Amino acid sequence: MPVSRMRMRPWLEMQINSNQIPGLIWINKDKMIFQIPWKHAAKHGWDMEKDACLFRSWAIHTGRYKVGEKDPDPKTWKANFRCAMNSLPDIEEVKDKSINKGSSAVRVYRMLPPLTKDQKKERKSKSSREARNKSKRKLYEDMRMEESAERLTSTPLPDDHSSYTAHDYTGQEVEVENTSITLDLSSCEVSGSLTDWRMPMEIAMADSTNDIYQLQVSPLGSSSEDEDEMKSNIIKLLEPTQDWHTTSVEGKGFFTNEPGTQTMCSTFGYKEQDGEIDTSSAELEFRMMDQKSSLDFSWLDTVRPMQAISCSL
């Protein structure tokens, strides 16, 4: 049979009023606000009689620790005390006044007024209603999971697997269509000669290498010959055109390269026997004629006659 003990709130009030635990005091007794020393053991170190005496007293009160039977465990005492404080419905923490760091760390709590019978009943009914709803919801989910599992495991597989295939009427339609196609093909006449509808096409094939083809490729010429021919053509294009023409003025023959001048025949005596030119009757002189000048050639008399150049007309 469990040992009856005082609940935490009256026990805590008795400890505060006794003033036997250092740091456990009332801040505002009218508002039921008090503080508890809450030093961090790992960072600042604990004094068993000063910092952990409240947690040890609660462990002894709940029977979790007995002096001489177990080794002291201040961290476990503090964790158990914190869980018990958080589970109380009529005590809440005043977080804006608590100090969580440093050697003077404390937690401030407020004791709420005791609940009336109506509040207790309402709270109890609310909690019981929430518990019932939760249990019903869980039961419904479990039933659904069990039904789905049974449906998967208990579904029998048929011995005849013909139901997995397509229906028979589709195959019948296909067979009828195939029969009609076969009948149509049997009525057709197949001719072995295709010359009636194919257009004639003649392909000329070369019988030997001597045949002349429409498309011939000339052999590539030598690169040196092409370069020489190209150079000579460029030189001819760059050189000025000098077409020498024979003309005769006052019985004298001349060579001229000016375009637009009048061309006259010179008086030459030509011997067919030896192919020489007789220049006794006329003297050939080079004269530069200007097509814009007049036909007055009186100034030519002052020019010294030059040696005649033979030419063949």
UniProtKB/Swiss-Prot annotation:
Pfam families noted in UniProt: IRF
Gene Ontology CC annotation, any one: cytoplasm
The protein, known as: Interferon regulatory factor 1
InterPro entries found in the cross-reference section: Interferon_reg_fac_CS (IPR019817), Interferon_reg_fact_DNA-bd_dom (IPR001346), IRF1/IRF2 (IPR017431), WH-like_DNA-bd_sf (IPR036388), WH_DNA-bd_sf (IPR036390)
SMART domains noted in UniProt: IRF
Comp. bias regions, Basic and acidic residues: 117-150
Keywords: Activator, Cytoplasm, DNA-binding, Isopeptide bond, Nucleus, Transcription, Transcription regulation, Ubl conjugation
Keyword DNA-binding: yes
Position(s), cross-link Glycyl lysine isopeptide (Lys-Gly) (interchain with G-Cter in SUMO): 271, 292
Stretch list, region Disordered: 110-162
Localization (cell): Nucleus; Cytoplasm
GO terms, molecular function: DNA-binding transcription factor activity, RNA polymerase II-specific; RNA polymerase II cis-regulatory region sequence-specific DNA binding
Family: Belongs to the IRF family.
GO biological process terms held by the UniProt record: immune system process; regulation of transcription by RNA polymerase II
Post-translational modification: Phosphorylated by CK2 and this positively regulates its activity. Sumoylation represses the transcriptional activity and displays enhanced resistance to protein degradation. Inactivates the tumor suppressor activity. Elevated levels in tumor cells. Major site is Lys-271. Sumoylation is enhanced by PIAS3. Desumoylated by SENP1 in tumor cells and appears to compete with ubiquitination on C-terminal sites.
Matches recorded under CDD domains: IRF (cd00103)
Transmembrane segments: none
Domain of life: Eukaryota
Residue ranges of DNA binding: 5-113
Annotated function: Transcriptional regulator that specifically binds to the upstream regulatory region of type I IFN and IFN-inducible MHC class I genes (the interferon consensus sequence (ICS)) and activates those genes. Acts as a tumor suppressor.
